[in-house]
C-alpha cells in the first residue's frame, strides 16, 4: 500500500505564436550577417563526440529551416584585390633605410643644440661694433677649441645624452671560442646543448702542416677533380682473403656480404658459425661469389693489357735508339775533312805522281851542264 501519492505531471501549456498583421514590417527587416570562420583550438577537447550520422541529420535540419530565412539575409564578405606587382610588398631596400622615431628628433636633441651654438660662435657675436643678442643659449658660451669637448663635435664623447643609432637594421656576430666541440663533431650530439662554448660544426678541417704542404707544392686553393669522382662498385671488393691474407681461392660470400676462401671458411665455421669480420651469425650459409669472380677476371685482363702495352712501348723505344746512334755518327763525319770515296783510286794517284817524277828527272838530265852531258862528251872523244 502506497503511503505517498505521486503527483501527475501536467502538460506544458501550448503558446500560440502571434502572427504579425503587417507584411511590410517583414520586408523591411534586413539582417546583416558576417560570416566568421571558427578556429578550432587543438588544446580544447570535449568528452562528448557526436556521430557522423547525427551531425549530418542536424546539419540537414538546420539547412532546411534556415533556407527560407537566408533568402533575405545580406552576407558581407571581405575580399582584397591583388596589387599585380611581382616584387616584394615591402620597400625596395628591404627596410635598410628605415629609421626608429622613438627617440628625440635629430633636429632637437642635445647634439643639434651644441652644433648650433658652435656655428653661431664661429659667425661672431659682434656686428658693426655692436653685440648681437642670439638667445639665452649663448650666455657664457665659448667656442670649444683644442679641448675634448670641441674635438668631439660628433657628441659621442661628450657628457650628456648620446645620440642613439637611427637605423633599425643591425648586424649580429657570434664570436665563438676558437675550438670545436669534439662530441658534436664525432656524434652530432652534445650534452651542453646551446650553452656549449665550443663551436658545433661537423665539417672537415685541415691541419696547418697540410695547408703548408699544399702551398709548397703549389696546390693550395686548387680543386681536385678526384674528389668529385663517383667510383664504381668494384672498389668495394677486397683483394685478399681476410683469414689467410692470400689471394682468393674459390671465393665464397656470406649473408653479411663478406668474402673468404672456401677452405678458410670451412675451417672457421667448424669452430663457430659467426662471421670472422662482423661477428654476425651466418648460419653456415655460403654462396659462390660470382660478382667477385667476374671482378677478378676483369682485373686480370686489364693487368694483361697493361703489360702488353708496356712491352710494346719498350720495343718501340729500342727501335728508335739505333736510329739515334746513326744520326749521331753521321753528324760526326760531317765535321771531319772529306776523303776520297773509293780506296782503289789511291794507288792510281801514287802511280801518277811517280810518272811525273820520272819525267821531271829526264828533263833535268837533258839540261846542259849536267852529269849526263859530260859522260856523253867522253864517249865521243874515245870514238875519235
Swiss-Prot record:
Start-end of Basic residues biased regions: 1-11
Key words, A-Z: DNA damage, DNA repair, Metal-binding, Transferase, Ubl conjugation pathway, Zinc, Zinc-finger
Compositionally skewed regions (Acidic residues) per UniProt: 60-71, 351-384
Domain of life (superkingdom): Eukaryota
Annotated zinc fingers (RING-type), start-end: 241-279
EC number: 2.3.2.27
A GO BP annotation: snoRNA splicing
Biochemical pathway: Protein modification; protein ubiquitination
GO terms of molecular function: ubiquitin-protein transferase activity; zinc ion binding
Compositional bias per record (Polar residues), positions renumbered to this chain: 42-52
Pfam families: zf-C3HC4_3 (PF13920), zf-CCCH (PF00642)
Enzyme class (EC, first level): transferase
SUPFAM superfamilies in the cross-refs: CCCH zinc finger (SSF90229), RING/U-box (SSF57850)
Start-end of Basic and acidic residues biased regions: 303-312, 320-334
Chain spans, region Disordered: 1-96, 299-384
Annotated GO CC locations: nucleus; U2-type spliceosomal complex
Catalytic activity, as annotated: S-ubiquitinyl-[E2 ubiquitin-conjugating enzyme]-L-cysteine + [acceptor protein]-L-lysine = [E2 ubiquitin-conjugating enzyme]-L-cysteine + N(6)-ubiquitinyl-[acceptor protein]-L-lysine
This protein's name: Probable E3 ubiquitin-protein ligase rnf113
Organism: Caenorhabditis elegans
Amino acid at each position: 500500500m502506497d503511503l505517498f501519492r505521486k503527483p501527475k505531471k501536467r502538460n506544458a501549456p501550448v503558446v500560440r505564436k502571434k502572427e504579425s498583421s503587417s507584411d511590410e514590417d517583414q520586408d523591411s527587416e534586413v539582417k546583416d550577417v558576417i560570416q566568421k570562420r571558427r578556429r578550432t583550438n587543438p588544446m580544447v577537447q570535449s568528452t562528448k563526440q557526436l556521430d557522423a550520422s547525427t551531425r549530418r541529420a542536424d546539419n540537414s535540419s538546420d539547412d532546411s529551416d534556415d533556407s527560407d530565412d537566408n533568402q533575405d539575409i545580406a552576407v558581407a564578405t571581405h575580399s582584397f584585390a591583388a596589387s599585380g606587382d611581382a616584387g616584394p610588398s615591402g620597400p625596395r631596400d628591404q627596410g635598410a633605410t628605415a629609421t626608429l622615431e622613438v627617440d628625440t628628433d635629430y633636429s632637437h636633441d642635445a647634439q643639434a643644440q651644441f652644433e648650433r651654438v658652435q656655428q653661431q660662435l664661429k659667425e661672431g657675436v659682434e656686428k658693426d661694433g655692436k653685440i648681437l643678442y642670439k638667445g639665452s643659449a649663448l650666455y657664457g658660451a665659448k667656442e670649444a677649441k683644442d679641448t675634448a669637448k670641441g674635438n668631439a663635435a660628433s657628441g659621442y664623447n661628450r657628457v650628456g645624452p648620446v645620440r642613439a643609432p637611427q637605423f633599425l637594421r643591425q648586424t649580429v656576430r657570434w664570436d665563438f671560442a676558437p675550438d670545436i666541440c669534439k662530441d658534436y663533431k664525432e656524434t652530432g650530439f652534445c650534452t651542453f646543448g646551446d650553452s656549449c662554448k665550443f663551436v658545433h660544426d661537423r665539417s672537415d678541417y685541415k691541419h696547418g702542416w697540410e695547408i703548408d704542404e699544399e702551398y709548397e707544392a703549389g696546390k693550395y686553393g686548387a680543386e681536385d677533380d678526384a674528389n668529385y669522382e663517383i667510383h664504381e662498385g668494384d672498389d668495394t671488393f677486397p683483394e685478399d682473403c681476410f683469414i689467410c691474407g692470400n689471394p682468393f681461392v674459390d671465393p665464397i660470400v656470406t649473408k653479411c656480404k663478406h668474402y673468404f676462401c672456401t677452405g678458410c671458411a670451412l675451417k672457421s665455421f667448424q669452430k663457430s658459425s659467426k662471421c670472422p669480420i662482423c661477428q654476425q651469425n651466418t648460419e653456415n650459409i655460403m654462396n659462390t661469389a660470382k660478382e667477385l669472380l667476374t671482378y677478378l677476371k676483369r682485373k686480370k685482363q686489364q693487368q694483361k693489357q697493361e703489360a702488353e702495352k708496356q712491352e710494346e712501348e719498350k720495343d718501340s723505344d729500342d727501335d728508335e735508339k739505333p736510329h739515334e746512334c746513326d744520326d749521331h755518327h753521321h753528324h760526326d763525319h760531317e765535321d771531319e775533312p772529306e776523303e776520297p770515296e773509293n780506296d782503289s783510286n789511291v794507288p792510281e794517284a801514287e802511280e801518277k805522281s811517280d810518272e811525273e817524277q820520272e819525267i821531271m828527272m829526264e828533263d833535268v838530265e837533258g839540261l846542259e851542264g849536267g852529269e849526263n852531258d859530260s859522260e856523253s862528251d867522253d864517249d865521243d872523244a874515245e870514238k875519235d
